[in-house]
Every structure is written in C-alpha cells, then in structure tokens.
Regions:
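Extended, charge-rich alpha-helical interface modules
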Residues: 1-80
Length: 80
C-alpha cells in the first residue's frame, strides 16, 4: 500500500516550507523517542538520525534557493 504525501510543482518558497514542516515533524518524533528511552545506544542512534535530517534539510534548502522556477516534489509512504 502506498500513501502519496506530496506530488507536484511548487515555488521555491513553498517547497522549502513543505520540506521544513515534514522534516521538523520527523525530528520532533525522534526527540520524543529520546525522551522516552532509557537505552543510551538507542538515544545515540536517534541523535545521529536527527543530525542527518538537519543536514539533509540544510542541503535541500541550499539547493532549492539556487534554482529558478518551480520545484518538483514527490514523497510517499510505502507500507510493506
């Protein structure tokens, strides 16, 4: 089963806003799991994931800010 979250062309501003909202939701989820966890190894893995998400967002923003015209975004959840 697939759930289509995003599919379309967006202005650079809107593309950045959409990506920022989604990535921040994922970061908030990971932070919540860190707060619930007593497992140090699990917390460290989640902290690494947060840093990776932050870097991905930074890189994507930088890329989008240097593009002209509309940006195509596509994202889906694939349930297996």
């Amino acid at each position: 089963m697939d759930i289509q979250l995003i599919k379309g062309e967006f202005t650079p501003h809107d593309a950045i806003e959409i990506m920022t909202q989604i990535i921040h939701a994922k970061i908030k989820f990971q932070e919540g799991k860190i707060n619930e966890s007593s497992n140090e190894e699990d917390s460290k893995m989640r902290e690494r994931r947060i840093k990776q998400l932050q870097k991905n967002l930074y890189d994507a923003r930088h890329y989008i800010e240097h593009q002209k015209g509309k940006i195509s975004l596509e994202s889906q959840i694939h349930l297996v």
